[in-house]
Design a protein with these regions (language model features):
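Short, structured beta-strand/loop micro-motifs enriched in basic residues and often containing a Trp
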Residues: 26-34
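Short, surface-exposed secondary-structure edge patches
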Residues: 36-41
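Short, charged beta-turn/beta-strand-edge "cap" motif at the junction between a beta-strand
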Residues: 47, 53-57, 194
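Feature captures the catalytic cores and cofactor-binding loops of soluble hydro-lyases/lyases
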Residues: 56-185
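C-terminal binding/interaction regions
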Residues: 163-218
Length: 218
């Protein structure tokens, strides 16, 4: 019961921070991997909970793929990518259990948005702090979304991850490729949708307009 209340509070908190009206936003439940059609049904501000599989990825993983030209050993088509370097406990060769799995800052990885969608068919990215405007057009063009999650909620996120099913490139620990099985992961807020809408951009524009109004009143 408390988990459900906590999830809803986190989503409403995020919508309040970005100035969106929760009464006009849809609540959705999705399973990943998924396809472009389902992604394009989402709109900025929607609340989404996720079942299925998500892929943990971070800076060094993507540098290996795109800068060094090494193909990833996991299928990323239709994938949900989580920006993370999780805290785990090793149980044996290739076997790990979760300790703490939170998110890391997404903005420094924005340059990978275009090739993730174009070359690998990635459908969703989730992390902390959002993505800048340069991610909006690649996400619109390739049918992708960015899911926002409230920072500092790693304990709840870890609980929603049922199992670490697979790990690749262990030499990059903890920035390996991770495959997590999740249940009711979220709520996540669609912060950038596949139609060119971004809650982050909207907030920046609101702040700019208010600043202009303040200066005009001096």
């Amino acid at each position: 019961m408390w988990q459900s209340s906590c999830k809803q509070a986190l989503h409403l908190l995020f919508l309040d921070l970005v100035g969106s009206d929760p009464d006009v936003m849809a609540e959705r439940h999705m399973t990943f991997p998924t396809d472009e059609e389902k992604i394009r049904e989402l709109r900025a501000g929607d609340s989404v909970t996720v079942d299925g599989h998500i892929i943990g990825i971070r800076d060094r993983t993507q540098i290996r793929i795109f800068d060094q030209g090494i193909e990833p050993p996991m299928d990323l088509n239709g994938a949900f990518l989580l920006h993370t370097a999780p805290g785990v406990r090793k149980l044996g060769p290739g076997r790990y259990e979760k300790v703490s799995i939170g998110t890391t800052t997404s903005a420094r990885m924005v340059r990978f948005t275009e090739p993730l969608g174009r070359d690998y068919g990635v459908r969703a990215i989730c992390g902390k702090g959002g993505l800048p405007d340069e991610a909006i057009e690649p996400m619109r063009r390739h049918g992708m979304v960015y899911f926002a999650i409230v920072g500092g909620a790693a304990a709840l996120e870890t609980e929603q991850i049922e199992e670490i099913e697979e790990v690749a490139w262990e030499e990059l620990m903890p920035e390996c490729l991770w495959k997590f099985r999740v249940k009711d992961f979220g709520p996540l807020t669609v912060a950038i949708d596949a139609h060119g809408n971004s809650l982050y951009h909207d907030v920046q524009e609101q702040a700019r307009k208010r600043l202009e109004d303040l200066y005009a009143g001096l």
